[in-house]
Amino acid sequence: MPNYTAPVEDMMFLFDKLRNNKNYNDLEKYKEVNSELVKDILEEAAKINQNLILPLAKSGDENPTVLENGVVRTPPGYKEAYSKYIEDGWTSLSCDPKYGGQGMPKTVSAFFDEMLSSASLSFKLYSELSIGAYNCISHHATDEIKEKYLPKMVEGKWSGTMCLTEPVCGTDLGLLKTKAIEQ
């Protein structure tokens, strides 16, 4: 089984250095965020990543997600782990409280993302596009669209996706041809 120990103390060192930055401390929305709260969050994050997500790393590497007869089948253990992941509120860590988020600084969610990536990158990728979709909607959508989509995304009931326009790959770069001409 793979081994991973979340570097909580290193993360706390970084958080405390950032927290001591006067500009960061002056942000009203983070007035209640302190080292004790962040350490508690990171210690819980370490537990879920080391005890629940890490054991899935091999399963995710060896059992790809497949579409069978219109049904998506994920690697063994993923469905249960994702249910626990959303039940514990990890999808909402740095999301706006207006939509059900916890309102933590992006720094805290970056620490969690590092743990999640280290424990099982394949599992992390299930939520990755949702974060991007959440950010896109929260920064650019109308209030009506935000009210419709963001609460369900924050709750983990709806997820985001990437819509690729190229039929053969995720980018057109592979279709480019270059030629070197001596000058």
Describe each model-derived feature in a short phrase.
Residues 106, 110-114, 131-136, 162:
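Contiguous, well-ordered alpha-helical segments that form the cores/surfaces of helical PPI scaffolds
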Residues 94, 102, 144-183:
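Glycine-rich, Trp-frequent "lid" loop and neighboring beta-strands that shape
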Residues 1-125, 144, 148:
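Amphipathic, small/basic residue-rich leader segments at the start of a protein or domain
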